[in-house]
Amino acid sequence: MALVIGFALVFWAIRAIGSSGGEGFYAVLSHNAMVAIFAPAFLLPLVSVAISLRRFWAEVGGKPLQLSDLMSAFKRAGKMQDLAAGHGEGCNFQDEDRFSHGRRHIHHAIMYGFLLCFASTSVATVMHYGFGLHAPYGFWSLPKLFGVSGGILLTVGCGAMVLLKQKSDRELGDPSAWGGDIGFILLLGFVGLSGLVLYALGATSVMPALLAIHLGSVLTFFLLMPYTKMAHGFYRLAALIRDAQRKRELSVGC
């Protein structure tokens, strides 16, 4: 929370310096300023994750990638197949003998919500630099459709995950990591929620303050990415790829 507030104040200070002009959000903070701040904040954490993944890959004896291994891993990840458990009844995450697919469905909402938000930014970048189509975009444009639907899934999914973790038995996991997990989920959900509020009130006088808060939360999320549970997505995908390699090797050996 301190980081979110701090970064929001930084953006507010940048806004006070002024903008070179533009429409919508760019009237508050120029496009070049956003790129200068967010490009390194996004790329440097990815470099950190890439270095650790390379070490992990060597540790587990990973082999050169094949398309079939990648397709198998992405298929399992997309379906959240392992959260259905081997018996297909879901996870027993509570202190009861009851299985549920709730955890799987909530993970689906968070993952696809995040991917839609990422797709929104990616499409907007291509439209801006590739086709000269600059923001703001209308509601029926791909950036808005991806962003709004992704923000809703992300907000609802993170809220449901917090409720689920409140009900779950903490002793089934690492109790010392529980607080960090909750903090990360709340931050990710706040990114989605603040984006939706910013879209809804983007034409009002509170837009500059909302923009500062939203961008501050996004920047915080990027910088903390290698040190939060967000990193488990990268490792999980790598583990699924290695598992696909092992299965292929066993089938060839037989």
Kindly label every feature range from the protein language model:
Residues 1-254:
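Membrane-embedded alpha-helical bundles of multi-pass integral membrane proteins
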